[in-house]
């Protein structure tokens, strides 16, 4: 019986590892999603593209965030 309990605990440990892995993978996919779309573009690059396409970088007196610039660049394509 004790051996069975021992194997059970290791099995449980394995299962706890599983979701944590998928969780980190999910977070990772979130990151790769944007970078894959824009090939790891930096904020400077986004600003340059926006300028070349005539997209305003400032809105309501403040600079647009990288994600907002991304959206506008995507729309203008």
Swiss-Prot record:
Polar residues biased stretches: 1-12
Compositionally skewed regions (Low complexity) per UniProt: 17-27
Coarse class of the protein's main subcellular location: virion
Cellular component terms (Gene Ontology): virion component
Localisation per UniProt entry: Virion
MF GO annotations: DNA binding
Region ranges (Disordered): 1-38
Top-level taxon of the source organism: Viruses
Entry's induction text: Expressed in the early phase of the viral replicative cycle.
Keyword vocabulary terms for this entry: DNA-binding, Virion
Family according to the record: Belongs to the asfivirus P10 family.
Role description: May play a role in genome packaging through direct interaction with viral DNA. Binds to ssDNA and dsDNA with the same apparent affinity in vitro.
Protein's UniProt name: Structural DNA-binding protein p10
Organism from which the protein derives: African swine fever virus (isolate Pig/Kenya/KEN-50/1950)
